[in-house]
């Protein structure tokens, strides 16, 4: 049971529900206090970064821990996504090369990750991201222990009809195969939207019953809009 988390509040929430789950703190910009609490209070060992300052912060906040899983997030094109995250998060390949080498020195397990952007409508974006990881592997001669292909898997909306999720997984498998590695790293992903976007829950109060009609304190212009 693994969960991607982006804040200390998410960590606390999940740990209250199940204290045994494995958490990955994959936000690349974290406060030193949240890193320290995640590590010492909640047993988090996986942290994401996209710059040297964040790496330094992680090491300081964990007292130079020797059991860290450090994920270097690289920036890739988000051209096929509804929400572009590439300008905000991720290291350019030119910067990632040195960052991968540096993170390797301080991690028990090294990961490389990317994110194709939210609600990605073209599965080829994932193989492009894997191709960029392949370029980094060739230039650094470092094979990561873990590759995280991130999230961005699309859900169905009234004006957006993506291909089935299995097609995205097939594209990822193809991209991994094209890396041509003798030993494959562990492959993980963050499929949150694709799993839960079409579900939801609401708590409402019945104000009036008129024969077979119930009138509640919510409606089309509230949480029932979708």
Enumerate the predicted regions with their spans.
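Active-site-proximal beta-alpha core segment in soluble small-molecule metabolic enzymes
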Residues: 1-146
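C-terminal active-site-proximal or functional interface alpha/beta core segments in diverse enzymes
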Residues: 122-226
């Amino acid at each position: 049971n693994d969960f991607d988390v982006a804040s200390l509040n998410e960590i606390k929430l999940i740990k209250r529900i199940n204290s045994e789950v494995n958490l990955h703190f994959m936000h690349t910009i974290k406060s030193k206090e949240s890193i320290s609490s995640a590590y010492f209070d909640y047993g988090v060992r996986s942290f994401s970064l996209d710059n040297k300052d964040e790496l330094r912060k992680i090491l300081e906040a964990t007292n130079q821990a020797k059991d860290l899983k450090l994920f270097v997030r690289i920036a890739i094109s988000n051209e096929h996504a509804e929400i572009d995250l590439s300008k905000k998060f991720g290291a350019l390949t030119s910067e990632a090369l040195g960052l991968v080498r540096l993170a390797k020195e301080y991690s028990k397990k090294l990961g490389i990750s990317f994110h194709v952007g939210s609600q990605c409508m073209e599965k080829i974006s994932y193989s492009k991201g894997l191709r960029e990881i392949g370029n980094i592997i060739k230039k650094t001669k470092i094979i990561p222990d873990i590759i995280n292909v991130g999230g961005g898997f699309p859900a169905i909306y009234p004006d957006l009809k993506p291909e089935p999720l299995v097609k995205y997984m097939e594209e990822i498998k193809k991209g991994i195969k094209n890396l041509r590695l003798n030993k494959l790293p562990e492959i993980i992903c963050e499929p949150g939207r694709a799993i839960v976007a079409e579900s939801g829950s609401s708590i409402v109060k019945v104000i009036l019953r008129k024969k077979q009609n119930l009138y509640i304190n919510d409606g089309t212009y509230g949480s029932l809009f979708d």
